[in-house]
C-alpha cells in the first residue's frame, strides 16, 4: 500500500464566524459565543480579536467578561450551526466517501485514491476550502499529511484560513521543536505531568524510553511514544458508505412546461455527473423522481447493463424516464435525478479539471 494522503479540515472559529457572517456589523470585533455569564456558562468559541484578550474556548463566561468587558457576547444558535455544518459535510462527501467527522466544524478526509501526478493533495484541499467559502461564506484551515495525527497538527499551524503540509522530510524538524502543549491530545493536566517529568517539547518526548512513558502515563504512554516519532496507523473511519448520488430541485412555481423541465433535468444530470467524477464512481441504476403540485411523489428507475457516469449518459436515461412519468395535465413542483448501484471508476482519463 502506498503512502496515505489525509486532510484534516478545521473551520476557523466556527460559531463566531457564522455569527459574523450573519451579522456583518460584528466583523473585526471581539466576538464571544457562549452561555450567560450570570450562570455557569462557558465560552463556546471566541473570534481571533477576542483571543487577543486571553479569551478561549471552555473558559467561564464570567472570566471572559473580566478579560474582555467590551466584547460582543452572543448566545449560540445551534440549529444554524448544524445547518451550516451539514453543508460543509456534504462538500466533503462530494470529494470522497471516506470522511470522519469529529465535530460540527472539523473532519478527516482520506483522499489517497484521488491523488495523482497531475492532482496533488494540496490542490484538492484548496478546492475543498474554495467550495466551503463559496457555499457558506466561511474560511477554513487544512492540514495535509500521511496520517491523522500529523494532519490534525498541520491544520492548526497556519490558522486562520491557511493550509499546511507535513511531509516525511520535514516531520522531524516540526515535531522536535514543537511545544509539548501543542501536541494534539495533550491537555492542561497532561502538560503539567509532562513538565514535572522534564518534557517541554517534542525532542524531550522523543528522548524518553517507551517503558518510562508507559510508567508515567499508563496505556497512553505507547501512543505518546509513537506521536513523538510521527507514527499513527489509525484509519479514517467513514460512518456511511454512499450507495447513490443524486440532486433534486424544487421549482419556484409549479410547472408543466416540458422544455423548462428538461432543461432542469439536464442541469441535474450534469451536477450528478460532477459528483460522481469527484468520488470516482459510476452507477448501474438511474432514478427520476417528481413531486406533483398535489405533493404526490412518483418515480421511475432503470437498471443498466454497464455502469455510467457521464452527464450525457445520465441525461439520456433520465430523459426517457421522465417521459414515462410525465402527465401534461399535472404540474410538478420538484424533480430529482439519482444514480445508484455505485462501483469504482477507472480514472486514467480524468484530469484536474474534473475538480474545478
Swiss-Prot record:
Transmembrane segments: none annotated. It catalyses: DNA(n) + a 2'-deoxyribonucleoside 5'-triphosphate = DNA(n+1) + diphosphate. This is DNA polymerase IV. Its EC number is 2.7.7.7. Its main location: cytoplasm. Pfam families: IMS, IMS_C, IMS_HHH_1. It comes from Staphylococcus carnosus (strain TM300). Mg(2+) binds at residues 10, 105. The active site is at residue 106. The gene is dinB. InterPro entries: DNA/RNA_pol_sf, DNA_pol_Y-fam_lit_finger_sf, DNA_pol_Y-fam_little_finger, DNA_polymerase-Y, DNApol_IV, IMS_HHH_1, Rev_trsase/Diguanyl_cyclase, UmuC. The record marks 15 as: Substrate discrimination. Poorly processive, error-prone DNA polymerase involved in untargeted mutagenesis. Copies undamaged DNA at stalled replication forks, which arise in vivo from mismatched or misaligned primer ends. These misaligned primers can be extended by PolIV. Exhibits no 3'-5' exonuclease (proofreading) activity. May be involved in translesional synthesis, in conjunction with the beta clamp from PolIII. GO terms for cellular component: cytosol. Its cofactor is Mg(2+). It is an enzyme of class 2 (transferase).
Amino acid at each position: 500500500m502506498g503512502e496515505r494522503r489525509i486532510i484534516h479540515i478545521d473551520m476557523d472559529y466556527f460559531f463566531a464566524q457564522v455569527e459574523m457572517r450573519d451579522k456583518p456589523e460584528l466583523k473585526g470585533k471581539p466576538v464571544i459565543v457562549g452561555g450567560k455569564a450570570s450562570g455557569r456558562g462557558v465560552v463556546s468559541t471566541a473570534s481571533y480579536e477576542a483571543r487577543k484578550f486571553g479569551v478561549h474556548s471552555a473558559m467561564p463566561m464570567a472570566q471572559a467578561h473580566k478579560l474582555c468587558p467590551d466584547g460582543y457576547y452572543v448566545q449560540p444558535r445551534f440549529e444554524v450551526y448544524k445547518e451550516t455544518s451539514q453543508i460543509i459535510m456534504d462538500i466533503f462527501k462530494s470529494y470522497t466517501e471516506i470522511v470522519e467527522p469529529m465535530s460540527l466544524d472539523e473532519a478527516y478526509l482520506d483522499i489517497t485514491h484521488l491523488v495523482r501526478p497531475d492532482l496533488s493533495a494540496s490542490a484538492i484541499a484548496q478546492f475543498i476550502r474554495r467550495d466551503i467559502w463559496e457555499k457558506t461564506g466561511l474560511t477554513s484551515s487544512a492540514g495535509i499529511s500521511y496520517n491523522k495525527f500529523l494532519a490534525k497538527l498541520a491544520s492548526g499551524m497556519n490558522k486562520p484560513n491557511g493550509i499546511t503540509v507535513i511531509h516525511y522530510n520535514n516531520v522531524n524538524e516540526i515535531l522536535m521543536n514543537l511545544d509539548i502543549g501543542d501536541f494534539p491530545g495533550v491537555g492542561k493536566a497532561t502538560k503539567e505531568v509532562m513538565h514535572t517529568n522534564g518534557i517541554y517539547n517534542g525532542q524531550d518526548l522523543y528522548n524518553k524510553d517507551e517503558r518510562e512513558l508507559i510508567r508515567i502515563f499508563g496505556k497512553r504512554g505507547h501512543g505518546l511514544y509513537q506521536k513523538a516519532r510521527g507514527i499513527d496507523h489509525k484509519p479514517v473511519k467513514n460512518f456511511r458508505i454512499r450507495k447513490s448520488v443524486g440532486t433534486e430541485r424544487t421549482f419556484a412555481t409549479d410547472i408543466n412546461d416540458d422544455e423548462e423541465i428538461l432543461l432542469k433535468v439536464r442541469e441535474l444530470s450534469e451536477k450528478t455527473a460532477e459528483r460522481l467524477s469527484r468520488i470516482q464512481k459510476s452507477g448501474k441504476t438511474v432514478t427520476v423522481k417528481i413531486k406533483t403540485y398535489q405533493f404526490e411523489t412518483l418515480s421511475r428507475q432503470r437498471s443498466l447493463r454497464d455502469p455510467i457516469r457521464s452527464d450525457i449518459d445520465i441525461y439520456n436515461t433520465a430523459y426517457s424516464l421522465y417521459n414515462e412519468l410525465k402527465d401534461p395535465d399535472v404540474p410538478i413542483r420538484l424533480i430529482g435525478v439519482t444514480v445508484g448501484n455505485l462501483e469504482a471508476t477507472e480514472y486514467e482519463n480524468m484530469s484536474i479539471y474534473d475538480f474545478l
